[in-house]
């Protein structure tokens, strides 16, 4: 018997159950089986979403930066377990925070600015 662990990022064009079915069908062709511990849909909101706009407005109002736009990244987040929520973080342009590395960091000034963005974001979200 051979076993392996696979960490799949579900594309925004598919549902988690569709990916599960594709894996099951493929393994069945090879007389294999799959045991899925957790699978869910991807987390994605279009740029025009009121949530994205509220968060982006908070960022622009605090930083004055209109050049950098919201970005979508592939990654896991516990935000997926809640409805109508977006993962929103303090990564500021121009700084390599070495995210998820042994020497990951954030500048104190960056954290202070992020807190101001979060405060503005909460006000904007409450207004939706």
Feature names for model-found ranges:
Residues 1-24, 40:
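Midchain, well-structured core segments that form catalytic/ion-binding scaffolds
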Residues 33-128:
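An extended, acidic, His-containing surface patch that forms the Zn2+-binding/catalytic region
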Residues 1-3, 29, 83-85:
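Active-site lining segments that contact anionic ligands and/or coordinate catalytic metals
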Residues 6, 28-33:
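Transmembrane helical segments that form the transport core of multi-pass membrane transport proteins
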């Amino acid at each position: 018997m051979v076993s392996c662990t696979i960490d799949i990022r579900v594309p925004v064009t598919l549902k988690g159950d569709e990916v599960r079915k594709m894996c099951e069908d493929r393994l069945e062709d090879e007389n294999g089986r799959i045991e899925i511990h957790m699978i869910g849909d991807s987390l994605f909101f279009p740029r025009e979403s009121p949530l994205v706009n509220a968060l982006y407005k908070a960022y622009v109002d605090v930083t004055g930066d209109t050049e950098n736009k919201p970005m979508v990244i592939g990654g896991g987040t516990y935000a997926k377990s809640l409805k109508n929520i977006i993962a929103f973080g303090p990564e500021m342009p121009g700084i390599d925070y070495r995210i998820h590395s042994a020497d990951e960091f954030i500048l104190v000034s960056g954290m202070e600015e992020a807190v101001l963005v979060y405060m503005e974001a909460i006000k904007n979200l409450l207004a939706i």
